Amino acid sequence: MRFITKITSTLIFSFGLVNAASYSVDNVHTNVGFSAKHMMITNVKGEFKTYDAQIDFDEATKSFKTFSANVNTASVDTGIEKRDEHLRSDDFFASEKFPKMTFVMKSYESDGNEGKMKGDLTIRGITKPVTLE
């Protein structure tokens, strides 16, 4: 679950926002990437190709009013198809049974420069609270 937290925080903070408004993430200019330990020796990097997110951000207060994201688990791509198939299997994401992972923000706190977003992350039908920094 730790690397999924990095995925979501990368999605949230990897694009610039300008005025108070509601946004849909532009998949051309953002990505949902991850890095995970492999055999405790190296890191495997990858991304999810299909996702969407809805954001309501207030530039004046530098705060998120709402944030939610849906990631298609079958769109995982590490550059090695055999590994991707394994990640889609019941051993990991169980993409056929659980095609989406979701994050829904519950609260956001900021000191003006950095922020912490608390919310619920759901993977394989299991929801856990996480804090993104």
For the regions a language model picked out, list residue spans one by one:
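Sec-dependent signal peptide recognition
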Residues: R2-T10
